[in-house]
Curated annotation (Swiss-Prot):
It comes from Staphylococcus epidermidis (strain ATCC 35984 / DSM 28319 / BCRC 17069 / CCUG 31568 / BM 3577 / RP62A). It comes from the Bacteria. The gene is rpmA. Belongs to the bacterial ribosomal protein bL27 family. GO terms for biological process: translation. This is Large ribosomal subunit protein bL27. Keywords: Ribonucleoprotein, Ribosomal protein. One of its GO terms (cellular component) is cytosolic large ribosomal subunit.
Length: 94
């Protein structure tokens, strides 16, 4: 009696899939104007999530916590107490 030892191979190669390969778009957060820089009213000063920096004098806070200048003037980043920071805009005397 003949015994045949046959081994069959897959006719198609197994294809693996991955759940990686994508990333969210960066939100471009952070300072948009530097300390001592002249800005016009409505200019965005700082984009943030939450209140990393608080609004100071002549600075407003938008719905997404973006800080913007209310008047034309010079930007000043300052400390507010021990552990907080704020940004203010001061009018320039002419």
């Amino acid at each position: 009696m003949l015994k045949l030892n046959l081994q069959f191979f897959a006719s198609k190669k197994g294809v693996s899939s991955t759940k990686n390969g994508r990333d969210s778009e960066s939100k471009r957060l952070g300072a948009k104007r530097a300390d001592g820089q002249y800005v016009s009213g409505g200019s965005i000063l700082y984009r943030q999530r939450g209140t990393k920096i608080y609004p100071g004098e002549n600075v407003g806070r938008g719905g997404d916590d973006t800080l913007f200048a209310k008047i034309d003037g010079v930007v000043k980043f300052e400390r507010k107490g021990r552990d907080k920071k704020q940004v203010s805009v001061y009018a320039v005397a002419e």
